[in-house]
């Protein structure tokens, strides 16, 4: 059992020769980073060592896991037939008159979903259909997925009817090249190289930071960035303060460079929970960070709470006091993006130190207990996240002011 040998013999120290040998062989692949790769390190450095250095892969089964389901959902929602249906339907309704329930019943959403699912060559859809056909409960599973997609499309019809932001760029890849004190990215439309100078030089080699942005919606010169999630997810000021990576703030930086935009052009960066049964359309409003400058100037400022978990005052002239940690001015968003970028590059510095000890985390004093538990949890597919020793002293509005330097 090689895992037992890893636990018993590995002393959590890598010699300089071993590190250099590893980099000489693996550097092309190792120097390509993503949000998930950095997240492995921040939540548990030993997990990063096992998964990203030793290359021990997770056990996989032929089953409908959350990854496959997520790809299936993305493929259906990004199909041109679905996007066009959302825009056509959203253009026909008066949101002040029609109820959420009427949106589902008024439009033949299921017909569009069936057409896209059964007339599609996308491997993300075909693979799921093939697995479903092998399961005894395949009809129930498929009908459940169709029902969920029906709700998800109804959510987007309401969103479009209110905001008029159109899903335009779907599942777009980005690559940020970091070399010395400069970040480079090719603009999507012109293919020109866009550069951004770092505030300081970090002790890391040249790397590429890559990823996919699920969805970018467009209204005139403004964009809104949306990332689909299988469960309820929101932005955390506490995580940002602890030095962790924020997915949506990383996407904000990527979009600024990929589309040659400024923060003043971005309505917000949000998470959209993939619809489940038993909830209402309102449960799937956007969560994340809104640009208060654009929201308060928009035609839907009074109806903001209908499309996102962010409230404005009655006349839509200010952000509700209880929600000020969810909305920021363009300049304040710049500060958050810079803070997140510093977090990312600092984590990369730690990774390239090749020190995967767990001294910064709350762990048992027993020798290698946390490392053993990490292996067991990793093998069983359960959560491997550790709790940092450092705690955030401030909360809510006070933490907001601290991070923004106010």
Locate the predicted segments by residue.
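RecB-family 4Fe-4S metal-dependent nuclease core
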Residues: 2-406
């Amino acid at each position: 059992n090689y895992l037992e040998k890893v636990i018993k013999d590995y002393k959590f120290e890598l010699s300089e020769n071993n590190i250099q040998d590893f980099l000489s062989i693996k550097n092309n692949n190792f120097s390509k980073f993503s949000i998930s790769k950095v997240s492995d390190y921040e939540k548990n450095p030993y997990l990063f060592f096992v998964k990203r250095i030793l290359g021990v892969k997770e056990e996989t089964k032929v089953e409908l896991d959350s990854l496959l389901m997520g790809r299936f959902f993305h493929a259906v929602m990004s199909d041109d037939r679905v996007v066009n249906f959302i825009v056509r339907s959203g253009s026909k309704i008066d949101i002040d008159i029609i109820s959420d329930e009427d949106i589902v019943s008024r439009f033949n959403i299921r017909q569009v979903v069936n057409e896209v699912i059964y007339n599609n060559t996308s491997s993300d859809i075909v693979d799921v259909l093939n697995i479903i056909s092998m399961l005894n409960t395949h009809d129930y599973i498929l009908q459940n997925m169709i029902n969920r997609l029906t709700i998800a499309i109804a959510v987007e019809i309401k969103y479009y009817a209110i905001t008029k932001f159109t899903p335009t760029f779907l599942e777009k890849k980005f690559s940020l090249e970091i070399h010395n004190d400069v970040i480079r990215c090719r603009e999507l439309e012109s293919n020109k190289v866009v550069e951004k100078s770092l505030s300081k030089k970090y002790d890391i080699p040249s790397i590429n930071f890559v990823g996919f942005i699920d969805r970018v919606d467009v209204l005139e010169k403004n964009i809104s960035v949306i990332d689909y999630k299988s469960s309820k997810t929101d932005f955390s000021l506490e995580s940002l303060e602890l030095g962790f990576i924020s997915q949506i703030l990383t996407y904000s930086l990527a979009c600024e460079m990929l589309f040659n935009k400024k923060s003043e052009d971005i309505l917000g960066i949000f998470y959209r929970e993939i619809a489940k049964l038993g909830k209402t359309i309102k449960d799937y409003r956007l969560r994340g960070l809104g640009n208060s400058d654009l929201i308060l100037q928009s035609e839907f400022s009074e109806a903001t709470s209908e499309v996102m978990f962010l409230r404005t005052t009655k006349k839509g002239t200010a952000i509700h006091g209880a929600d000020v940690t969810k909305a920021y001015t363009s300049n304040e968003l710049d500060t958050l993006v810079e803070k997140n970028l510093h977090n990312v590059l600092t984590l990369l510095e730690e990774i390239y130190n090749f020190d995967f000890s767990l001294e910064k985390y709350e762990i048992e004093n027993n020798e290698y207990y946390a490392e053993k538990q990490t292996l067991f949890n990793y093998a069983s597919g359960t959560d491997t996240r550790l709790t940092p020793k450092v705690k955030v002293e401030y909360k809510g509005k006070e933490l907001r002011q601290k991070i923004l330097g106010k």
